[in-house]
Amino acid sequence: MFLGTHTPRLDDKGRLILPAKFRDELAGGVVITKGQERCLYVFPTPEFQHIADQLRAQPMTHKAARAYSRVFFASAHDEVPDKQGRVTIPGHLREYAALDRDLVVIGAHTRVEIWDRVAWESYLAESEDEFADIEEGVLPGL
C-alpha cells in the first residue's frame, strides 16, 4: 500500500527518484500513465495488469470504456526503475501534467501519483472544503 507525501525534484533528463519507501514495491517494474486532474498515475506492473484485465472485461460496444482505454493505454509508459530508484517520465507525460522541477509524489493506496508542486497545492486548496463533505458519501459512519 502506498501512503504519504514526498517532494522530489525532476532532473534535467526528466528522471524522478522514487521515494525510498515506495521502491521495494515498484522495483519489479512500473507503468506510468495519465491520471485524473492532470496528474500522473504510477502503478506497479501487476496492479496495471489488474486494471487492464478489468478494462478488457468491458464489452467493445461500451463507448466510454473504449474511449477511456484508448487514452489510458496510449499514454502508458512501462519501465523498470534503475539501481538508484529512478524512472524517466516521457516528455508527453511531463507535458500533460505540466511538470516543472518541483514535484509532489503521493501514495494513493494502490498507486502513486505524481503532481507538479504548484498544481498539487492548488488542488489541495480547492478540495479541502469538499473533503469533509464527501467523507460521509465515501465512508459512511467514519
From Swiss-Prot:
One of its GO terms (biological process) is negative regulation of DNA-templated transcription initiation. The keyword DNA-binding applies. GO terms for molecular function: DNA-binding transcription factor activity; transcription cis-regulatory region binding. PROSITE patterns: SPOVT_ABRB. Residues 5-47, 76-119 form the SpoVT-AbrB domain. The keyword Transcription regulation applies. It is found in: Cytoplasm, Nucleoid. One of its GO terms (cellular component) is cytoplasm. Keywords: Cytoplasm, DNA-binding, Repeat, Transcription, Transcription regulation. Its main location: cytoplasm. It holds the Pfam family MraZ. PANTHER family: TRANSCRIPTIONAL REGULATOR MRAZ. Belongs to the MraZ family. Forms oligomers. This is Transcriptional regulator MraZ. It comes from Salinispora tropica (strain ATCC BAA-916 / DSM 44818 / JCM 13857 / NBRC 105044 / CNB-440).
